[in-house]
Amino acid sequence: MKIFGLFLITALAEIIGCYLPYLWLREGKSVWLLVPAALSLAIFAWLLSLHPAAAGRVYAAYGGVYIFMAILWLWAVDGIRPTTWDLVGSGVALVGMAIIMFAPRSV
C-alpha cells in the first residue's frame, strides 16, 4: 500500500505540474503559474527517485496510477463525470500496475 500511495502523490505532482501551464496557455491565466508548475514537476522527478524498484519497472507501473489519477482529476477539477469506460479502463490500468509491481520475482 505504501508503494501505491507514493505513486498517487507522484501522479498528483505531475498532473499539477502540467495543468498549470495548460491554464496559462489555454485559459489565459497568469504566466506566474509556470513557477509553481516547475516546482511541482521538480517534486515529481524527486518522488520518482524514491520508488524502490528499477526505474523502467517504476515508469511502466506508474503509468497505470497516472491514468487513475487523471480520471479522478477529470471528475474533481474539470467537473466531468467519468464514463463507465473511463472507470473500466482505469481499473484495467491499475490491475496492470499491480501485476508489474507486485508479481513474484527472483531478481
From Swiss-Prot:
Bilayer-spanning residue ranges: 3-23, 30-50, 60-80, 84-104
Protein name, as recorded: UPF0060 membrane protein PSHAa1175
Superkingdom classification of source: Bacteria
Family matches, as InterPro entries: UPF0060 (IPR003844)
Cited Pfam families: UPF0060
Family classification: Belongs to the UPF0060 family.
Metal-binding is among the record's keywords: no
Chief location category: membrane
Membrane topology: Multi-pass membrane protein
Key words of the record: Cell inner membrane, Cell membrane, Membrane, Transmembrane, Transmembrane helix
GO annotations of cellular component type: plasma membrane
Subcellular location field: Cell inner membrane
Native species: Pseudoalteromonas translucida (strain TAC 125)
